[in-house]
Amino acid sequence: DLHLLSRRQRQMCIRDSLGTTFTFKYQEKEYQTHIQMVGRYNVYNYLTAMLLIHELGYEIDAILALNTKLKAPKGRMELIVYGTNGIFVDYAHTPDATLNVLESAQEFKKGRIITIIGCGGDRDTTKRPIMGEIACKHSDHVIITDDNPRTEDPQKIINDILVGVSGDYEVINDRHLAIAKGMSLLKENDILMILGKGHEDYQIIGTKKIHFSDQEEVEKYIREHIHD
């Protein structure tokens, strides 16, 4: 009985970097609501959760009224605003997840999409060129960097990613420098996607876990360039 209305039936989703407004039909009644999350997959996840809560006896309107209190989990399309730019930190570290978040960004972009991506060491090597290909296909510029290389040679990991890349990209092994470069490239209305670590606050190099946070790196850059 639940239908997410198509664009022909109604403007289904109005998206910007701050959230998604959408219309759905349930038991012959139409509802419009807003969630502070972006991405079509988050709309579907929300509707699934809403129906489960409704089955427990809660009215749809009562559930929708709580939407202002909903926030995406830390590191899941987590937004940091920088002037007209949206910087998203996301845990995407598989081909499917990378495709989902970049397709979501395409839906509301007004400028370019710049993507920072890497792959973990001592993990599935077959996904590396695939993720490189996806990042390049759905971004205007890609920065390939380290992401928990562990005991593998970081350059070997990057070389594996490079097998799938094309177009406008560059390699900056040091993730701190990669994020700073991505931030420096931003022009009006551009989006920066920083993928792979999400909620993690560490970088694993060799067998050592070193403190590192994508969010902190972005916030530090903003503080240092606030008067630029």
Where do the language-model regions lie?
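A structural connector/turn signal
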Residues: D1-L2, Q36-V38, K181
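Short glycine/threonine-rich catalytic loop with a Thr-x-Gly-x-Asp
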Residues: T20, M37-T48, K71-R76
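ATP-dependent carboxylate-amine ligase
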Residues: Q27-E28, T48-D228
